[in-house]
UniProtKB/Swiss-Prot annotation:
PROSITE patterns in alphabetical order: FAD_FR
Protein name: NADPH-dependent ferric-chelate reductase
Region forming the signal peptide: none
Compartments reported by the entry: Cytoplasm
Length: 254
């Protein structure tokens, strides 16, 4: 029997900047607006990791975005100011040849503001994902911790796991400011999803109660940078394999 641990694997993608067209705008949840993109530039798009991120470049009034040149030495940007950009989880439908981005709607965000105003025919430049972390789907136990910013990646992962003949044991701790956001994951059955107040101490207290198996597990923690750092400390103990614990900041409080 091969007892070698199974670990997530990193893969690289060729970096391309794609100008895509808004095909549809859908309010898929009380808290999320979906923008569906398409176009010939989507040819060759690939995204193998459930928490991949693509960088979106938001158009500015009276300004035409000129993408940089990608060379073997790196990215060469043209002179002048760059448009604002944000990282988002790509939800790619290979059969329909469409790329969906789910935006958490909140006040004051350049991305949220654009998503609320977007109309079919609008243009959006999308870069990446530059690389993917391919996480095995069949870990016996899987723990996911996130706030609203990580919910699209969590949704993508759970939709994939739901298609397995044998589902793994999954626990998800999702902290939200508004319980109306829960409908974003309402269609996913067979998983233990716990909804918590948007409070670091509440999440940490719940983590302290959880029993993580000694092997064959995967742990994923995302959210605000300092919160992720603090929550992930308990998984730095020697009984946890760092290659099966993924902690990533999705945003930073100002």
């Amino acid at each position: 029997m091969n007892n070698t641990p199974r670990y997530p694997q990193r893969v690289r993608n060729d970096l391309r900047f794609r100008e895509l067209t808004v095909l549809r705008v859908e309010r898929i949840s009380a808290g999320f607006q979906r923008i569906v993109l398409g176009g010939e530039a989507l040819d060759g798009f690939t995204s193998r990791g459930f928490d991949d991120h693509s960088k979106l470049f938001f158009p500015q009034p009276d300004a035409h975005f000129v993408p940089p040149t990608v060379t073997e030495e790196g990215i060469v940007w043209p002179e002048g100011p760059r448009p604002p950009s944000r990282d988002y989880t790509p939800l790619y439908d290979e059969l329909r040849h469409e790329l969906a981005i789910d935006f958490f709607i909140h006040d004051g965000g350049v991305a949220s503001g654009w998503a609320m105003q977007a109309q079919p025919g609008d243009k959006l430049t999308v870069a990446g994902p530059r690389g993917s972390l391919v996480v095995p789907e069949d870990y016996a136990y899987q723990l996911y911790v996130c706030d609203e910013s990580g919910m699209p990646a969590l949704r993508r992962r759970l939709e994939t796991l739901s298609k397995l003949a044998v589902k793994p044991q999954v626990s998800a701790l999702v902290s939200v400011r508004d319980n109306a956001c829960q409908d974003y994951l309402a269609h996913l059955d067979g998983f233990n999803i716990e909804w918590l107040a948007h409070d670091e101490q509440a999440v940490d207290a719940r983590l302290a109660q959880m029993q993580i198996p000694a092997d064959d597990y995967f742990i994923w923690i995302t959210g605000e940078g300092k919160v992720v750092k603090n929550l992930s400390r308990r998984f730095e103990a020697e009984q946890y394999d760092p290659q099966r614990v993924r902690a990533a900041a999705y945003w930073h409080a100002k």
